[in-house]
Amino acid sequence: MNKRKIELIIAFLIIIIVTISLFIIFKKDSQDFVYKGEKGEYKFDIQQIGTVTFYRPHVFVGGKEYIYAFRNKPQNLEELPLESGILNKLNRQGGLKELYITKDVNLSSQIEGNVNIVTAPMASILGKTDFGIYRIRVNSAYTSFHAGEPVAPTVDCSTVNYNGKVNKTVGVVYLKLGNDNKIYSEGDCIIIEGKDSDGLIKAGEKFAYHLIGVF
């Protein structure tokens, strides 16, 4: 094979590599989108892990970028009811010190073990990890005594609504199954309700989107 043919083959391979690279970049960019939310525009990128698609909003707070992962894009949650001003239920005069995300003992079995999928976005945003914006101590709890592992406290809406008075340092988010997919409150207790596993995940993510200002 002469030198000219080798040069042509190399040039052809370079063209193929560049074309494939541009296609991959274009495909990725074409999947990104900007969503006009309640508090501004949010850039989203899309990530595929196995069979699961994640929608990842980019949030900037105090000059720092936070990226979260959701299973539902905001366009698909717009009609899900969210009580107006519900974040006020987490306001405390001296600052909220602790938040319990509580659920009935049998909830995990009722929603196919997907409790962590429901809570992951909101816990990441609220918590004290590097991903947390609110920097609140977030704990898992049950509404009645739970003898299994790990040991968890017993917390329900009465924990925050005690004799008509609001607990001055603690907040409660109660996950439950019900007749609708929605986010509402009873007193100062925030309730995230879903008709089934999928509905509860959607309601949980709608609340998490609300925490970062998308809704």
Predicted regions and their residues:
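Long, low-hydrophobicity ectodomains and other hydrophilic envelope-associated domains
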Residues: D32-Y35, Y42-F215
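Secretory targeting signatures
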Residues: M1-Q31
